[in-house]
């Protein structure tokens, strides 16, 4: 009986360990530096060279500068995508494609105007994942996305809230500059 229990526990540990190497959880350290944007993503290996990833970003914060200027990069973002890894999943170079949706409100970062709206689109990215240990990687990436802005309004400033531009339009933007900590 004792041998059966030990064998069962050993089998579960082996199965769990092998499964854990096919899944990852990561967070973008540079994202946290972007006015405290909370971000998390989870990935799973679909094949030797393909992985699937889902994730999101959330930033409810608004800051006041000493000059009285409000600064914010508020957002709710979700995405799902796949990555192609020429070497092995979660190791080395990769290319990615994703679908993304975002609701945002930002002001005071690059200009005084207030930009609010919702958008969806498709993104392309590339990067390199460096293996630190068996369970920890650092992921470097850069990418962009394009799509459609809907429910979009651009105001002259936060105080006057005079509408400068409104309505749907298309966009292309740099999106992912990431240095992520990945745990497998």
Put a short name on every predicted segment.
Residues 44-140, 180-181:
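Gram-negative (and chloroplast) outer-membrane scaffold detector with strong preference
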Residues 21-23, 34-38, 74-78, 116-122, ...:
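Residues that define the transmembrane beta-barrel architecture of outer-membrane proteins
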Residues 24-41, 59, 67:
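Solvent-exposed loop/turn segments connecting transmembrane beta-strands
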């Amino acid at each position: 009986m004792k041998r059966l229990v030990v064998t069962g526990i050993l089998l579960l540990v082996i199965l769990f360990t092998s499964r854990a190497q096919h899944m990852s959880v990561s967070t973008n350290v540079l994202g946290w530096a972007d006015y405290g944007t909370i971000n998390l993503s989870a990935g799973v290996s679909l094949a030797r060279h393909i992985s699937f990833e889902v994730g999101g970003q959330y930033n409810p914060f608004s800051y006041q500068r000493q000059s009285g200027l409000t600064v914010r990069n508020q957002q709710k973002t979700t995405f799902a995508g796949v990555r192609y890894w020429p070497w092995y999943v979660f190791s080395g170079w990769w290319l990615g494609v994703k679908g993304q949706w975002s609701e945002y409100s930002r002001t005071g970062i690059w200009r005084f105007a207030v930009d609010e709206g919702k958008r969806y689109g498709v993104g392309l990215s590339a990067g390199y994942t460096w293996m630190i240990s068996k369970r920890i990687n650092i992921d470097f990436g850069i990418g962009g996305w394009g799509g459609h802005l809907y429910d979009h309004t651009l105001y002259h400033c936060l105080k006057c809230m005079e509408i400068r531009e409104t309505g749907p339009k298309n966009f292309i933007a740099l999106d992912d500059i990431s240095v992520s900590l990945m745990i497998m």
